[in-house]
């Protein structure tokens, strides 16, 4: 899968691309990640990429010419999506990651800055995606989150694909608690059911933990899950 990052700060990605899951996926040939800097497509000696907004107002706006030129310079691998990371976009979810991981072979991620990009650049954008209902100083942070979330769902990236099938949100619920050795740590014991070897009992315990956690910590998700179950039962 190919990822193209349109970014004013390619150095932001140097460490993440050289460590952990992303680096391993690149080394195995499962992913290509390329950074393209709009400054390289400017014509003035100061490599100016922003300007004051028409109509006045605070902040600066990214100019259309260097962004459009950067986007048009990229090779096209189909199917692909061009995504602008923006607080106005649809929120990132596990379902969104799963959809992108299975439906596209190229993701172009446009990292915004300042007050945003000139609206005319939206001609090149397929969709806007947001990390959440808050504002950050740059689009590189949500771009990295999106890259990581999608890439880990691609076949071969994670050793055991069962790992991501059991992730939080994969079935609309939060994850269950995890334990490892030792069986007792500073007086805190692993639940007996996990030591029993009874796979049916373990599965039931984990499901109950998922339900309780989701109900207590994310009642919005729990209500959505209940509604989904009601729909399934009615059919």
UniProtKB/Swiss-Prot annotation:
Q: Keyword set for this entry?
A: Cytoplasm, Methyltransferase, S-adenosyl-L-methionine, Transferase, tRNA processing
Residue positions annotated to bind S-adenosyl-L-methionine are: 112, 131-136
Q: Where in the cell is it found?
A: Cytoplasm
**What CDD domains does its record include?**
TrmD-like
Keyword Cytoplasm listed? The answer is yes
Which reaction equations make up its catalytic activity? guanosine(37) in tRNA + S-adenosyl-L-methionine = N(1)-methylguanosine(37) in tRNA + S-adenosyl-L-homocysteine + H(+)
GO BP of this protein: tRNA N1-guanine methylation
| GO molecular-function terms, A-Z | tRNA (guanine(37)-N1)-methyltransferase activity
The keyword Transmembrane belongs to this UniProt entry's keyword annotation: no
Q: List the Pfam families hit by this protein, alphabetically.
A: tRNA_m1G_MT
Supply the enzyme class, top level.
Answer: transferase
Instruction: Give the enzyme's EC designation.
Output: 2.1.1.228
User: What cellular component terms from Gene Ontology apply here?
Assistant: cytosol
Q: HAMAP family given for it?
A: TrmD (MF_00605)
User: What does the sequence similarity comment in the record state about its family?
Assistant: Belongs to the RNA methyltransferase TrmD family.
Its function, per the record, reads: Specifically methylates guanosine-37 in various tRNAs.
Summarize subunit and interaction data from the UniProt record for this chain. Homodimer.
Protein name per Swiss-Prot or TrEMBL: tRNA (guanine-N(1)-)-methyltransferase
> What species does this protein belong to?
Synechococcus elongatus (strain ATCC 33912 / PCC 7942 / FACHB-805) (Anacystis nidulans R2)
| Lineage per the UniProt record | Bacteria, Bacillati, Cyanobacteriota, Cyanophyceae, Synechococcales
């Amino acid at each position: 899968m190919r990822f193209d990052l349109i970014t004013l700060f390619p150095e932001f990605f140097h460490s993440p691309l050289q460590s952990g899951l992303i680096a391993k996926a690149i080394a195995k040939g499962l992913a290509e990640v390329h950074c393209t800097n709009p400054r390289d497509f400017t014509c003035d000696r100061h490599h100016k990429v922003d300007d004051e907004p028409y109509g006045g107002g605070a902040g600066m706006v990214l100019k259309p010419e260097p962004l459009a030129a950067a986007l048009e310079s990229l090779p096209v691998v189909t199917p692909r999506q061009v995504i602008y990371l923006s607080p106005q976009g649809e929120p990132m979810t596990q379902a969104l990651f799963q959809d992108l991981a299975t439906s596209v072979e190229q993701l172009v991620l446009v990292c915004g800055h300042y007050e945003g990009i000139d609206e005319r650049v939206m001609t090149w954008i397929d969709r806007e995606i947001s990390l959440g209902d808050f504002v950050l100083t740059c689009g590189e942070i949500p771009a990295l989150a999106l890259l990581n979330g999608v890439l880990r769902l691609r076949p071969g990236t994670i050793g055991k694909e069962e790992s991501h099938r059991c992730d939080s949100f994969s079935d609309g619920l939060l994850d269950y608690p995890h334990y490892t050795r030792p069986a007792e740590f500073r007086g805190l014991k692993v639940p007996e059911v996990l030591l029993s070897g009874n796979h049916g009992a373990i599965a039931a315990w984990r499901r109950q933990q998922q339900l309780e956690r989701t109900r207590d910590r994310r009642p919005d998700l729990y209500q959505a899950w209940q509604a989904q179950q009601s729909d399934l039962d009615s059919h």
